Amino acid sequence: MQYQSTRDKNLKASSAQAILNGLAPDGGLYTMPSFDEVKFDYTTVLNMDTMSMSTKILSKLLPDFSEAEMAKLVHDGYTGKFETDHLTPTVPVGEDFILELFRGPTSAFKDVALSMLPRLMTASKEKLGVDDEIMILTATSGDTGKAAMEGFCDVPGT
């Protein structure tokens, strides 16, 4: 499956290329042409633990990575960084449920994505034969910069 730019569907990239590029050359975002291309039975993940669920879903959405490769990336990205093995537990509040997105290292919901991004970027680099180190520059007044720096901290190749 090739990802395509939101501004020009003829600009395509593999999932590894899209991860490393971030944006398409025309400034568009990379998206799948159609979710129909991803055949996925969501009932298979309903009773999985968070790590297994993350592995299964991400390996379907990012086909350049095998399920075994993704399992290692998920393990390395999340293990020991969150207050609970569930990462973002769903807790009952009366008759409702709340998804707690503040259990990561910086208490920001962005920890979920930014704990995986450096692992995905370094693995994409290897797949594409890129030798350059990854440099992240942040300028923010909010929690994004802190979450990004925490996610990339001590990750080899960054």
Roles of regions detected by a PLM:
Residues 1-158:
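PLP-dependent amino-acid enzyme catalytic core
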